[in-house]
Every structure is written in C-alpha cells, then in structure tokens.
C-alpha cells in the first residue's frame, strides 16, 4: 500500500471518528508577476494575507507557561496590537507533557495546569486565535514528544482544544521525506474539519517553496533568525542575511501560500531602532508573516511604533499578495519594489552602509512611464509628499530605510 493510499484510508477513518547577490537594474513588469491563486487550489483556503501574531520562542524559548501566555494575550489587546491585525498567539516548543496510555498528548501539568483547551478558550474570549507547536520527528527540537506516528491522533487533539494554527518543525526526523511528512499532517488537520493554518518549519532544506503551497500556508525559507544585523551566528542568521536568502523566492509567494523568513526580532534589544525599522520594512515588502517575537508586556514606545505602523502593515497585508523584490543594487544602496492592489507600488530604499546615502527609485524601475505623475506618501513619516514625476528619493540613514507608497 502506497503512502498516498495510506493517507486516504486514514482520512476516511478519521472523518468517521470525528463525524461529529549584486544585481542589475530591473523594472517591475506586470507580465512577470506570479499568477493569482484561487483559494480552492491552495492547501486549505486559509491565510489569504500573511498571518500576523506573536510566537513565544524568540523571547522565552522553553521558559513558557500559561501565566505568561495569558499576560501576552492581555497585552496584545490593551496595547493595540490586536487592533493592528496581530491575532495569532502561538505557543512554541516545550508546552508538551507526556502521552497517556492511549498515546494522546497532554500539556506539561506544571507549566500549563489549566490545560491547553482552557488556554485556547481564554485567547478566543479576547478575540485572538490560538497556535501551537509540534514536530514531524519522534521528538521536538526541545526534546518533547513529537508527532511522528501520531499525526491523526494529534490533529484530533488540536482540533478539540480549539487550535487555529500549527507550527510544525523538522527536528529528529531521520530519513523521513519532508514533503510526505508535511502532507501527512496537512491531511490530518484537514480531516478534522477545523480551519487550522499550517506553518511548515523545515528551514528550506528541501525546497518547500516547490511543494508547500499545496500542503501548507507558509514555509520557512532559511534557518532560524537571530537578533543580529547580518551573518551566521551558530545555527542562526542575521536579519539582512535572511532577507538576501528569501528575496529570490518571490515567484512562489501569494495568497494562501507565503515564504516565511522567520519571526520578527523587533524589540528584543540586539539591534538599534533604525535597524528594527529596516527589518520590519523588509518583512512587509516581502509579504512575510508578521509574527512578533518580543515581550508584549514590556514593549517600549519605539517598538510599538514599529510593529503598529499601519502604513507599513498595510503593505504587508495588501490583498494582491505579491512578494516585493530588489530591483536595483549598487554597493550598499538598494531599491526594492512591491506591486500593490489598485496599481500602486510600495518602494523601499535600503542603506546597508555605515554612512548616510542618497538613494532614488526611478519610475522605470517601478514599471511606470517616466512622465507619469504619481502621489507619494512617506510611510515612516506618515506624510504625503505630493505628486512626483520620474523618481522619488531620500537621504537614508546608515542601516536605515526610506519607504514610500506611490500611487499613479
């Protein structure tokens, strides 16, 4: 019996049970945009814009418990994060307890004495959605019970708990085939009848952008992010290094299926506020999931201003769903462009250097006629700059950005 047949049989059984680089100048050409996807042709019709929310790992690692998660949920509501669009609260690794005699997974009774269902109910009562973490191996990255061999059983449990989002990792998987392993969990989640977003976290090792769109809603394209500007640090990558690896994958992204350059580090203290604005702007330009990773209960005003910049969030959440790309680079200066619904363009001027730099985006780079008049809005200054022809530019701070919305 083939793996595909096994999955089909398992789905039927479960349904019965549940019954109840340096680049040259390049213009944006509308003919090169990736085709729009009908939700019915994607994995499950969910995540038609990039998911937004919070994940526990970047800030708390394994030091997570229900008291912390409830405090985060309360802070997301009171701070305005929920109103800004951040709706998922995802509990990452180390929530697990043991499996019972029947193999059913439970929560760590010390960390989550009230149980996961009660926690999910609390988040839902606050108008938020609940996400959880598991792994395609026998054990998670943190050494807790993984889902290998328990995919349908765990999916049933997650659905009964009220889970809305599953981050599915790739530690301790041995010789498993990644596409088959993720397809198995995808089938299990769909068979429950509950809408659960599937986040594929296999670090880009097996080219998930080639197959993830028919299985999940987002897929990690790189190893883990770290709160550094650039370079590799142990097994993790700095912000700019991840942006460079994620950028060429733009043709694979679209509504319901997103490239995921990993969670945000904004507010965790390793970068300057200028660098965090660059980080956030790049993620928005790349139509990346905006999953905050800071301590929600201890946000300073600068962090709030970055994460809740409604103009920049709107670029990320644009309904056209096109991932932006770099169209010009010269030394440390770059121009990125993202087509938006209604014919507008988001433009990001990036200065990777150590000194201020003058950078301009030309209408040719944007795929617009040179003499066309267009209104320009500065998305970080929240200021309309009037109508321009031919180009829009700025003097950009070291490691900084200028970001515009250009509407013909």
Regions found by a protein language model. Name each.
Residues 11-20:
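Bacterial N-terminal signal peptides
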Residues 50-56, 85-92, 129-134, 164-169, ...:
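Structural recognition of the beta-strand scaffold that forms the well-ordered cores
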Residues 25-66, 70:
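N-terminal module-boundary/linker segments of secreted carbohydrate-active enzymes
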Residues 128-144, 190-207:
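Aromatic-lined carbohydrate-recognition surfaces of secreted/lumenal glycan-active proteins
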Residues 387-408:
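C-terminal beta-strand-rich structural cap/linker in extracellular carbohydrate-active enzymes
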Residues 283-286, 291-293, 329-368, 399:
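Carbohydrate-binding surface patches
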Residues 72, 76-175:
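Aromatic-lined carbohydrate-binding/catalytic grooves of carbohydrate-active enzymes
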């Amino acid at each position: 019996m083939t793996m595909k047949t096994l999955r089909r049989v398992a789905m039927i059984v479960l349904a019965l049970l549940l019954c109840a680089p340096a680049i040259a100048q390049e213009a944006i050409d509308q003919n090169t945009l990736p085709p729009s996807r009908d939700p019915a042709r994607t994995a499950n019709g969910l995540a038609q814009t990039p998911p937004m929310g919070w994940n526990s790992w970047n800030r708390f690692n394994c030091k997570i418990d229900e008291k912390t998660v409830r405090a985060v949920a309360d802070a997301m509501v009171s701070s305005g994060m929920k109103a800004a669009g951040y709706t998922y609260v995802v509990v990452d690794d180390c929530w697990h307890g043991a499996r019972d005699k029947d193999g059913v997974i439970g929560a760590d009774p010390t960390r989550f004495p009230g149980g996961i269902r009660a926690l999910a109910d609390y988040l839902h009562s606050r108008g938020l959605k609940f996400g959880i973490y598991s792994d395609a191996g026998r054990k998670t990255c943190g050494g807790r019970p993984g889902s290998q061999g328990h995919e349908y059983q765990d999916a049933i449990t997650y659905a009964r708990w009220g889970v809305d989002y599953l981050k599915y990792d790739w530690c301790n998987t041995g010789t498993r085939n990644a596409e088959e392993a993720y397809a198995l969990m995808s089938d299990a989640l769909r068979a429950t009848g509950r809408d659960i977003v599937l986040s594929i976290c296999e670090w880009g090792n097996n080219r998930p952008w080639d197959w993830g769109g028919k299985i999940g809603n987002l897929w990690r394209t790189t190893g883990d992010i770290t709160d550094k500007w650039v370079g590799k640090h142990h097994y993790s990558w700095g912000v700019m290094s991840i942006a460079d690896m994620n950028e060429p994958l733009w043709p694979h992204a679209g509504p319901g299926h997103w490239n995921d350059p990993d969670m945000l580090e904004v507010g965790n203290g390793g970068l300057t506020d200028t660098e965090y604005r660059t980080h956030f702007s790049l993620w928005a330009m790349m139509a990346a999931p905006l999953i905050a990773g800071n301590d929600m209960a201890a946000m300073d005003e600068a962090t709030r201003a970055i994460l809740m910049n409604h103009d920049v969030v709107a670029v990320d959440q644009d309904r056209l769903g096109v991932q932006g790309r770099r169209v010009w680079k010269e030394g440390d200066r770059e121009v990125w462009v993202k087509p938006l619904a209604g014919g507008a363009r988001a433009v990001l001027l990036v200065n990777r250097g150590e000194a201020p730099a003058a950078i301009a985006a030309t209408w040719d780079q944007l795929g617009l006629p040179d003499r066309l008049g267009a209104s320009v809005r500065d998305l970080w200054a929240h200021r309309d700059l009037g109508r321009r022809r031919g180009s829009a530019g700025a003097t950009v701070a070291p490691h900084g950005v200028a970001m515009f919305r250009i509407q013909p």
